């Protein structure tokens, strides 16, 4: 159903329109996307006729800044924080609404000789400002379009249009697939674009490495920063870096302040952390990644709010969903980049979570074996562990 990102890029370079679909838990919509330089009157008319939604022009912050395109509102209350600027028309257009005139305005946005005074405000073209970091910062159609443009070697501007059904309802994947098939368009997902970017873009910087004696042995600790969100991650290493031969014992551990530091009995995170360090030390060779993904990615305060809901009878999955989050928001692309920086290509993964295996393999790493890391359940965390087993697919046995 969906095409590889590489095929979509080739289609865009040829001037074709593609379709980009986001996740079911977000807008669950598809947009037509074309590079701004190929936004001919025919392309604009195609989008207006078959998309029926609002035609917008995602732009990089650089282009928006050069043309003095400011946010439409000072306080954005849109649920997805879509960054509209004030709408525009080129000053040489008449009504500005025809396909020809909208195409003219879009093309002028790309002209490096264009100045802010060349555009009237308001108008019939709706620029959108993409966040720096693209889909790795915000998984929206705006960022996806600009990321695709940049990957094509373009300036970072596109034209997009939401796809609606003939009855005025929003088209979902089944209807969008039929549209793609009938018009022979490439169709991709933002999720696949995120994985593509993690695989082609280096987003971590090794900042420091030191020797750290611990209760489990002496480790070499490498400190990394993430260019997307500025978070700091650690790699506890035993053995010589880079790891150039044989599978390496690896644990990818997400931060849990309450469990790792304060020995909380609500989870098994602290015991897992210590057990993993002990096993790596016993093997004499391995890596423990400590990723700043508190509360399966929802953050410390939200995790505490989830705990409060659990006290009211929710399980760990239901609590996350009641707060408006997916059960697990973690992403392993940054972890995969750190492992690659350390020379890890093949590993034995300490985990009970099959999604973690799939997540790392999706970034080109090879996992030869899964090493279980099950801790003894307590009266305080037994229900939590059973929920992880039943609802999140963790490989646990009671």
UniProtKB/Swiss-Prot annotation:
The lineage of its organism: Bacteria, Bacillati, Bacillota, Bacilli, Bacillales. This is Riboflavin biosynthesis protein RibBA. Mg(2+) 2 binds at residues 27, 141. Pfam families: DHBP_synthase, GTP_cyclohydro2. Mg(2+) 1 binds at residue 27. Transmembrane segments: none annotated. The keyword Ubl conjugation does not apply. CDD domains: GTP_cyclohydro2. Residues 1-199 are annotated as: DHBP synthase.
């Amino acid at each position: 159903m969906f095409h590889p990102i590489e095929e979509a890029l080739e289609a865009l370079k040829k001037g074709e329109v593609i379709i980009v679909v986001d996740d079911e838990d977000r807008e669950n919509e598809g947009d037509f996307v074309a590079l701004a330089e190929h936004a001919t009157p025919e392309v604009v008319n195609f989008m207006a006729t078959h998309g029926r939604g609002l035609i917008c022009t995602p732009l990089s912050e650089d282009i928006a800044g050069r043309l003095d395109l400011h946010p439409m509102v000072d306080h954005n209350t849109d649920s997805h924080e879509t960054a509209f600027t004030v709408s525009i028309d080129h000053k040489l257009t008449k009504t500005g609404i025809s396909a020809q005139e909208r195409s003219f305005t879009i093309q002028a946005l790309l002209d490096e000789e264009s100045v802010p005074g060349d555009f009237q405000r308001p108008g019939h073209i709706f620029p959108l400002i993409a966040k720096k970091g693209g889909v790795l910062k915000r998984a929206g159609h705006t960022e996806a379009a600009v990321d695709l443009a940049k990957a094509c070697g373009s300036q970072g501007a596109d034209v997009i249009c939401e796809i609606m059904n003939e009855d005025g309802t929003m088209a979902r994947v089944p209807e969008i697939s039929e549209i793609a098939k009938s018009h022979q368009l490439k169709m991709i997902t933002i999720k696949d674009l995120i994985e593509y970017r993690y695989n082609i873009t280096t987003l971590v910087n090794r900042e420091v490495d030191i020797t750290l004696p611990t209760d489990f042995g002496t480790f070499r600790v490498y400190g990394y920063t993430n260019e997307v969100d500025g978070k700091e991650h650690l790699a506890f290493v035993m053995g010589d870096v880079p790891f150039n031969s044989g599978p390496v014992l690896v644990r990818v551990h997400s931060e849990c302040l309450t469990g790792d530091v304060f020995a909380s009995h609500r989870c098994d995170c602290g015991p897992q952390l210590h057990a993993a360090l002990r096993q790596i030390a016993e093997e004499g060779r391995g890596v423990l990644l400590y990723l700043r993904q508190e509360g399966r990615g929802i953050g410390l305060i939200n995790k505490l709010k989830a705990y409060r809901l659990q006290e009211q009878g929710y399980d760990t999955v239901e609590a996350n969903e009641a707060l408006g989050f997916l059960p697990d928001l973690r992403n392993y692309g940054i972890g995969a980049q750190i492992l690659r920086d350390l020379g890890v290509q093949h590993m034995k993964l300490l985990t009970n979570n099959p999604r973690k295996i799939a997540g790392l393999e999706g970034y080109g790493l090879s996992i030869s074996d899964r090493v279980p890391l099950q801790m003894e359940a307590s009266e305080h965390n037994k229900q939590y562990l059973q929920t992880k087993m039943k609802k999140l697919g963790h490989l646990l046995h009671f």
